Amino acid sequence: MMALCVMTHAVGVTVAARRLSVEQAARFSQWVWVFIRLAWLIVFLHLVEITLWAVLYLWREALPDLQSAIYFSAVTYTTTGYGDLVLPMEWRLVGAVEALTGILMCGWSAGFFFAVVSQIVHEHD
């Protein structure tokens, strides 16, 4: 599942990098729209990855229903960890792997976002 998340993120970030029209963002208001679109794309990628983990939990009957699986996955992926919903003992290590994956993917997203912002600011300084 971790590999699937990495592939999903890699494809999404690559598509974003190729489609962003950094050169066309000449004014501040245009930059803002580039940042907003990029932020939404990043959020969408994370939601897809959270859903992939949730489907795994549901498919393997580690959680009772889709709502619980998505909720648990979101809380785990973001490392919020409320603890109100837990996996069965044999699945707890998988939950930890999801949390590590979430940390890595969020870090990757932050780095990518920073790189785009830096490029825009540098090119239009």
Short names for language-model regions:
Residues M1-C5, H9, S68-H124:
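Pore domain of cation channels
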Residues A26-V32, D84-P88:
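Helix-boundary and loop/linker segments of multi-pass membrane transporters
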Residues T14, A54-L58, G111:
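Transmembrane alpha-helix boundary and packing residues in multipass membrane permease domains
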Residues V32-V48:
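Interfacial helix-start motif at the membrane-water boundary
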Residues A10-F28:
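Membrane-interface helix-loop junction between the first two transmembrane segments
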